[in-house]
């Protein structure tokens, strides 16, 4: 279950990649703008502000996120991105930090250009940090005998979940698009107790939390916290640097 409040705890850090992604989309007067994986809608509303004359279509697979987006006045619907098909007037498709959850996302990126009108834009951002300590430590802890019996079916993600920018660029170029792809590592300054643990609780640890009972979840967090604190030590000023690699691709259908 997604927790919109937990996700929004780091809204500024999560928002910056979205705005940098959209800065490369040069759509002037799109008819329909689509946000796939809109989350709680806090970033989606900026699409309406940028393109006020466009029809804004937003969806997410999480009912909690859809409810939060609707509370912001968005006409959001619950939908699996794999089931989405663009309407004929779709001129901009945005997916920010969502497709890493979809194993078939490469096939979607091949398919969408064949379904979109000429001149349409596709803008995608995915995390590229699955080999970072924030992920490897979780996978290691979950594999220990104490936890492996409780977490046999949790889909822990490795670096193969997403591709490098050049791979996405090639995929979309082969699909007939003009492509702009890049990566950025944000050295994020976090504050508070166990800030990296709090960050991943809203995303990477969600399947773990869903699989455990409340007492087990508390114990897992208790064991995980010092391991993350060692990998991401607190600085003398009380802050913690959390490097986070992200992958971007913007494509225009030719």
Swiss-Prot record:
Write out the catalysed reaction.
trans-aconitate + S-adenosyl-L-methionine = (E)-3-(methoxycarbonyl)pent-2-enedioate + S-adenosyl-L-homocysteine
InterPro entries the UniProt entry points to: SAM-dependent_MTases_sf, Trans-aconitate_MeTrfase, Trans_acon_MeTrfase_C
Its job:
Catalyzes the S-adenosylmethionine monomethyl esterification of trans-aconitate.
GO CC annotation: cytoplasm
Instruction: Please provide the record's keywords in A-Z order.
Output: Cytoplasm, Methyltransferase, S-adenosyl-L-methionine, Transferase
Q: Which biological process annotations from GO are given for this protein?
A: methylation
Keyword Transferase appears in the UniProt entry: yes
Q: Indicate yes or no for the key word DNA-binding.
A: no
The gene for this chain is tam
Compartments annotated for it: namely: Cytoplasm
Would you say which domain of life the source belongs to?
Answer: Bacteria
Q: Which family does this protein fall into?
A: Belongs to the methyltransferase superfamily. Tam family.
Give GO terms: molecular function aspect only.
Answer: trans-aconitate 2-methyltransferase activity
Q: What is its EC number?
A: 2.1.1.144
UniProt-recorded name of the protein: Trans-aconitate 2-methyltransferase
UniProt main location, coarse: cytoplasm
